[in-house]
Amino acid sequence: SQNTRIQQDVADLDKASGMVINDLMYKHWDHYVTTAPHPFVATFNGNSITGAEDIMKGEPYECPMEPFGGVEQLAWSPDGTQIAYTCRKKAGLKYAISTDSDIYLYNLSNKTTRNLCKPDGFVAPEVKVTESLERQSINSPHSTDDYNMGYDQNPQFSPDGKYVAWSSMMRDGYESDRSRLCVYELATGKKTYVTESFES
């Protein structure tokens, strides 16, 4: 058979272009996804970099996020002790159908991370992956909980370091949702949407 011939003729192997795919998001628009970018913190003395540390070590997620994310998805606190970053911590099919990214706060001294968009222990409602997210409980218009289920990205600290602001969308799975400016008070966890009364 043809398969046997290829296996016997080693010279033909370099002509093969097959790939083993074990995750849904193996390609993003125009390129294959083979790695996940991570932010690193390091010491720079003007000539060399030392002590590089991956602030998302061991996590299979990306920051900045595909396809348009860049350095605007990260922010240093004014006192240099924390980094706010954007990430969608989902994998496989859940990643592929969701726009639910969050803002995370990494503490450089104790190396802990907390989600500013959702409370500790939050578990998103299960979704029916073959149906639109629009009318599922994850996007319920009757919910009084503010879990920032859509895109949350591009964090910035206030000059006094007391607040983090970011662009926020309300609904999961809806890339054209209206962007709101969310201002988060670090001391209390209170969120304020300062653009709610604006016309869009």
Name these PLM-found stretches:
Residues 1, 80-83, 161-164:
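Hydrophobic beta-strand positions that form the internal "hydrophobic ladder"
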Residues 1-58, 86-89, 93-104, 137, ...:
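Predominantly five- to eight-bladed beta-propeller fold
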Residues 77-78, 107:
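A short, structured loop/turn motif at beta-sheet edges
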Residues 43-70, 96-99, 104-153, 168-177, ...:
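Multi-bladed beta-propeller domains
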Residues 1, 70-74:
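Short amphipathic alpha-helices and their capping/turn segments at secondary-structure boundaries
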Residues 55, 74, 80-83, 116:
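Generic structural hydrophobic/aromatic packing signal, biased to beta-strands
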